[in-house]
Amino acid sequence: DGESVITAQGEMGTYGTVYTSYLLKYDNTGNGGTVSGQGRGVVDKDTFFSGTFSGVWKRDGANIVMRNLVNISDGTTNLDSIVINTGQRNLSIDVYVID
């Protein structure tokens, strides 16, 4: 099969309620590879954001760790550092605005 899809939803401050899909493609080890996807943020009835991203992922025990470059519809480029804790069924994200 060679790929998996993870969907997530959560609150992200400036971007409001964010809905995201991650497409993980496996490398030959099966413990990492590339990731791409897109997301939508809804702040209020008049304020929406969209973004596309690509990066790399790897397994760290039961966690999935991703590093993505994100292009946001407002012209911002972010570096996202994401950890999905599969045991706890939660996600943490650190966002660094780089442009």
Descriptions of predicted regions:
Residues 1-99:
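Beta-strand-enriched cores of mature, soluble protein domains
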